[in-house]
């Protein structure tokens, strides 16, 4: 049987990585072999670390979105398939990426031919971010990207329903915007609804057939409105349970699209994130084995401010911790204009 490629899109902070980790675990319980391809505009991705810590084979496409780095994405997908013979390839594009159907799904279906089944394109939605977009609370060009992501979805996944007081309201908004998309209520954190989604998309006909018009000038402006930062920091001698919330609260910037941090100390692994519409840091344990006096922290920040200002804020927050923070690598930038390798209308 040929492997199935299941690409899961969605805006920054919507819960894509949590969903992929949960889906991989559920598929493994079914006896399926799973691999994951992650994606970011620069190396040093928290998402890749989370997937690898879950014991799932993974490859990272860094430096550009799947559409602009199509050859790298296709090559790494082929390598994972050759090495692990998976039943399912899960892939997560950059959270600000759009036009996936025309620039990734259809070109890949042509290139792979009968050697790969391309599942319906699923897009994850955080109800809080959806409300922010509907209220006009984010940059108009960035909101343009958000709405296009919804329009090109074959399947919409209304996530975080376990924390949503009235999921019927965002569900009605999605149905009005995207009446032709299948809609599932899920919680990537608890797993509610995920099995049903997997059953549906893995048994469905190939996806990626939706055609949308994209103004690439507005698309580029929407991405450039965000400062992006990836950093790796070594710390010593801290109360690790409190470090990530303190660090994130010290990055005192408005306009957070997604701020995600991962801390590893010995066998202790913590991850925390703050997203559009949910500013308070949410901390969870990925592993709870004994920690040591040393820790490594990965910081991924996507915030609506100039890259230099973002870098200064993060470096200042690290210094405020008072834990001898040694920055091992840091890069702050705004994404360059997207130039897809292919575009099949």
Located regions from the model:
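Non-catalytic alpha-helical coupling and interface elements of nucleotide-dependent molecular machines
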Residues: 32, 85, 109-113, 126, ...
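Nucleotide-state-sensitive switch-loop elements of NTP-binding domains
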Residues: 2-9, 14, 18-146
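Short, aromatic/basic amphipathic alpha-helical patches
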Residues: 48-55, 169-175, 312-318
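Canonical P-loop GTPase G-domain recognition
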Residues: 143, 147-157, 161-223
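A structural preference for short, hydrophobic beta-strand core positions in alpha/beta folds
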Residues: 36, 183-186, 327-329
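P-loop NTP-binding site
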Residues: 1-8, 13-14, 18, 203-345
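A short acidic, often aromatic-flanked loop/helix-cap motif at beta-alpha or helix-coil junctions
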Residues: 65-68, 189-194, 334-339
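Short acidic, S/G/P-rich loop/turn micro-motifs used as interaction or catalytic elements
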Residues: 96-97, 129-131, 163-164, 304-307
């Amino acid at each position: 049987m040929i492997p199935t490629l299941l690409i899961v899109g969605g805006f920054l902070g919507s819960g894509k990585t949590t969903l992929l980790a949960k889906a991989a675990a559920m598929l493994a319980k079914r006896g399926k072999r799973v691999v994951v391809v992650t994606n970011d505009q620069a190396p040093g991705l928290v998402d890749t670390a989370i997937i690898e810590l879950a014991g799932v084979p993974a490859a990272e496409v860094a430096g550009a979105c799947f559409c602009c780095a199509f050859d790298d994405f296709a090559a790494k997908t082929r390598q994972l398939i050759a090495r692990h013979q998976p039943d399912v390839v899960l892939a997560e594009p950059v959270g600000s990426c759009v036009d996936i159907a025309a620039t990734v799904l259809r070109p890949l279906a042509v290139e792979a031919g009968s050697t790969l089944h391309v599942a319906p394109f699923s897009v994850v939605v955080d109800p809080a971010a959806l409300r922010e977009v509907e209220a006009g609370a984010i940059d108009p060009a960035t909101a343009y990207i958000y709405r296009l992501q919804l329009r090109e979805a074959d399947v919409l996944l209304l996530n975080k329903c376990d924390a949503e007081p009235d999921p019927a309201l965002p569900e009605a908004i999605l149905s009005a915007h995207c009446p032709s998309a299948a809609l599932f209520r899920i919680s990537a954190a608890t797993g509610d609804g995920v099995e049903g989604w997997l059953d549906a998309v893995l048994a469905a006909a190939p996806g990626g057939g939706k055609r949308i018009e994209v103004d690439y000038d507005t698309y580029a402006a929407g991405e450039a409105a965000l400062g992006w930062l990836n950093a790796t920091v070594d710390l010593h001698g801290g109360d690790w349970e409190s470090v990530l919330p303190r660090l994130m609260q010290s990055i005192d910037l408005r306009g957070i699209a997604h701020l995600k941090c991962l801390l590893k100390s010995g066998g202790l692994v913590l991850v925390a994130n703050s997203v559009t519409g949910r500013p308070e840091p949410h901390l969870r344990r990925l592993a709870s084995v004994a920690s040591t006096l040393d820790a490594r922290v990965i910081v991924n920040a996507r915030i609506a401010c100039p890259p230099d200002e973002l870098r200064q804020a993060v470096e200042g927050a690290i210094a405020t911790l008072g834990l001898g923070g040694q920055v091992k690598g840091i890069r702050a930038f705004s994404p360059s204009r997207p130039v897809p390798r292919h575009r099949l209308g």
